[in-house]
Curated annotation (Swiss-Prot):
<feature type="disulfide bond">
    <location>
        <begin position="143"/>
        <end position="155"/>
    </location>
</feature>
<dbReference type="GO" id="GO:0005890">
    <property type="term" value="C:sodium:potassium-exchanging ATPase complex"/>
</dbReference>
<dbReference type="GO" id="GO:0001671">
    <property type="term" value="F:ATPase activator activity"/>
</dbReference>
<keyword id="KW-1003">Cell membrane</keyword>
<dbReference type="InterPro" id="IPR000402">
    <property type="entry name" value="Na/K_ATPase_sub_beta"/>
</dbReference>
<keyword id="KW-0406">Ion transport</keyword>
<comment type="subunit">
    <text>The sodium/potassium-transporting ATPase is composed of a catalytic alpha subunit, an auxiliary non-catalytic beta subunit and an additional regulatory subunit. Interacts with nkain.</text>
</comment>
<keyword id="KW-0325">Glycoprotein</keyword>
<keyword id="KW-0633">Potassium transport</keyword>
<feature type="topological domain" description="Cytoplasmic">
    <location>
        <begin position="1"/>
        <end position="45"/>
    </location>
</feature>
<dbReference type="GO" id="GO:0005886">
    <property type="term" value="C:plasma membrane"/>
</dbReference>
<keyword id="KW-0630">Potassium</keyword>
<comment type="function">
    <text>This is the non-catalytic component of the active enzyme, which catalyzes the hydrolysis of ATP coupled with the exchange of Na(+) and K(+) ions across the plasma membrane. The beta subunit regulates, through assembly of alpha/beta heterodimers, the number of sodium pumps transported to the plasma membrane.</text>
</comment>
<keyword id="KW-0740">Sodium/potassium transport</keyword>
<dbReference type="Pfam" id="PF00287">
    <property type="entry name" value="Na_K-ATPase"/>
</dbReference>
<keyword id="KW-1015">Disulfide bond</keyword>
<dbReference type="GO" id="GO:0006812">
    <property type="term" value="P:monoatomic cation transport"/>
</dbReference>
Length: 309
């Protein structure tokens, strides 16, 4: 086969020779070309130098960025607080015991005459109160109303004042007088604006408690428990609160103090009906705690059910 180059000259066209197949050992090291895995020693050195410099620069940039980020973060307090944070300024109200078995929901069902059933709830409360009962080695103070405290002071939650809701009384579960422990969720820097006098929306029993409490001791986030949606009011005439019907204001604000424990209110139901579901709603009362009883958007309150078999 020939072709004309445009000037009358003739030449032969040659097909390219197929590449010589390399053996596996030649792919690793080719002595003729002096290559190792297809690269010469110089080429490998240049490649290694490039990636070494590349990753050193990358690590340096990452370190600079992390240092810049960490310089804006405190080990002791969040950067965004209260209304600037996702948590906001409205603490939620929680309760214990709460079963780890999700199918139980918020129902506390038991028969005090059946040890296995009552012991289940007693053990849950024991676990919850473990930190409250073992405060050895912590820098804590026994606080009181009117006492001058430093912002970093941590006040003791005295479980000896829980009365009928004490460990010695099995939290009332052996005598069908169960106790529920209420606590406010911690919000950094939140300070309660308390009601030092009764409000028209408060239940009558809470109004009575406030009026009978000394003025200096009214600095509390009050709590009340009644029938959810106004039900079963007749079954809420015989309940007690320990050590008082509120969370004392001297426990606040929470500033991430070492050893801090949220205050508790123990609520004992002395005569719950047997064989009937008691639907309970407990509410926290403070000027800066919003309340909503909505199922989808509950605020400042919590609901649970008690069922004595």
């Amino acid at each position: 086969m020939s072709k004309n180059n445009g000037k009358g000259a003739k030449g032969e066209f040659e097909f390219p020779q197929p590449a010589k197949k390399q053996t596996f050992s030649e792919m690793i090291y080719n002595p003729q070309e002096g290559t190792f895995f297809g690269r010469t020693g110089k080429s490998w050195s240049q490649l290694l130098l490039f990636y070494t410099i590349f990753y050193i620069v990358l690590a340096a940039l990452f370190t600079i960025c992390m240092q810049g980020l960490l310089s804006t973060i405190s080990d002791t307090e969040p950067k965004w607080k209260l209304q600037d944070s996702l948590i906001g300024t409205n603490p939620g109200l929680g309760f214990r015991p709460l079963s780890e078995q999700t199918e139980r929901g918020s129902v506390i069902a038991f028969d005090g005459k059946k040890p296995a059933e009552s012991d289940y709830w007693i053990e849950l409360i024991d676990d919850f109160l473990r930190d409250y009962n073992h405060t050895e080695g912590r820098d804590m103070k026994h606080c009181g109303f009117g006492q001058v405290l430093e912002p970093t002071d941590v006040c003791v939650v005295n479980t000896d004042l829980f009365g009928g809701c004490s460990k010695a009384n099995n939290y009332g579960y052996k005598t069908n007088q169960p106790c529920i422990f209420l606590k406010l969720n911690k919000i950094f820097g939140w300070i309660p604006e308390v009601y030092d006098k009764e409000e028209k929306d408060m239940p009558d029993d809470l109004k009575k408690v406030i009026n009978e409490t000394k003025t200096e001791e009214r600095q509390q986030v009050w709590v009340s428990c009644n029938g959810h949606l106004g039900k079963d009011k007749e079954n809420f005439q015989n309940i007690r609160y320990f050590p008082s019907q509120g969370f004392p204001s001297y426990y606040y604000p929470f500033l991430n103090q070492p050893g801090y424990l949220s205050p508790l209110v123990a609520v004992q139901f002395n005569s719950p009906p047997k064989g009937q579901m008691l639907d309970v709603e407990c509410r926290a009362w403070a000027k800066n705690i919003q309340y909503s009883g909505s199922v989808r958007d509950r605020k400042g309150s919590v609901t649970f059910q008690i069922l004595l078999d």
